[in-house]
Amino acid sequence: VSDLTQAFGKVPFAFNWLGCDMGLVSAHKLGGPKGIGALVVRQGIELPSQLKGGGQEMGRRAGTENLIGIAGFAAAAEAAARDLANGLWDEVAEIRNILESELSATAIGTISVGNGVRRLPNTLCVAAPGWRGETQVMAMDLAGFAISAGSACSSGKVRASRVLTAMGFDE
């Protein structure tokens, strides 16, 4: 199972390119409603039913579908597809690259994680050795920037990122 939530609508891809059996996407990352998502399942993969009952979702999950959420997700996905086709995310990537260059030039010692490789256009990961994340977040907030010291799904955790550790970064 691959979490495609951040990439969906921001970079061109087709599920069959990825070589995974299942992929998850969420509407709220596209500006759609919270609480609605999609599980894309490769043809031939059998999933056991999670809730027994009616034949909704091809027998995989019984219960009334969230039609308003589905419609909101569809509208957000269509808007995201238009933005992608119109080059919006290319412009966002250019702005990210400018910010990254300026940080490297002015904030001595910062490390840009993922520089030089394909990555999401709207995400910049910067490490600043010797600075506590909480201190950076407060200072940047006071300066008018919205940053975080980790992902929203990891908020409240005090251990190092497994991904950054696997990439060779220290805690």
Task: For the regions a language model picked out, list residue spans one by one.
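Pyridoxal 5′-phosphate
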Residues: V1-E171
